[in-house]
């Protein structure tokens, strides 16, 4: 949502952002910004600032979880932009600070929308309303806009959970003194994995996220639950001692069910359009979920610039036509959890430039 707002604002559109949270906070943890996404931050005018925040690994490394042997290594240096890993909250703050503060509206939980031939009205739970020409639903896997378009459909549990934790301060220093830590690494063993990387330029914060297939869990409607170190030890008992040391050094550990949704028959309806997880949620196993949302935002902006706001319907059609194949491919590979498990060429992911891609007008147009 922040990317879409920034890009549309920079393109001259009058943009208001409605956020249900009462204020901005540094939530979340690590996120990858590949070269394909950094090119969009370049367009936003935020590339250098973002680069200064994150760690820039030379390569992505895959290791055998039992013995630490390298299974694959992919350089990320030759794709026309930097690859960084950074704290999600720091990246979001950079985007938010680029927006007109008078156009940011917090504490706005959407209740409903009403379309007319001339505009669309948003109704919020606090009793206020807002009117716009179009509404971009960048509201995640539990998207209210998606629900309005297609009806209530609970997310589908994928059969996987993710443990997440940060390592900082003296615990990180002690860990690093005893074990070599890769800048960005994914550990694989049997049916589970653990990805670890730094989230700051100073390398003073190390983050890991796992993928584990347990039985279905009941979160009581919450996005995540607190976990305990013993659960991590149990889940990764067969992993290398370096992983055991990382678990011991972890601060609070949380556990998140990974949910999916069925593919959408349409990405827009009337004056409403979806992007990102609201449209094509995926498991985080390629670290490209947010990336696909940001590419969506860039293509949607291009199509609205090309067609004009008055021709929003045509712009939405072009946007879906030019994004669906790539988003679906990334979604499929990510959900299969096979990316870089063995040596392969990742240029189809990182070498992509959403601004260099010609806009297709029909299915038959060659890319």
Regions from the language model: what does each represent?
Residues 1-22, 136-137, 196, 230-232, ...:
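Conserved mid-domain beta->alpha element of the FAD-binding
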Residues 165-198:
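Flavin-dependent oxidoreductases
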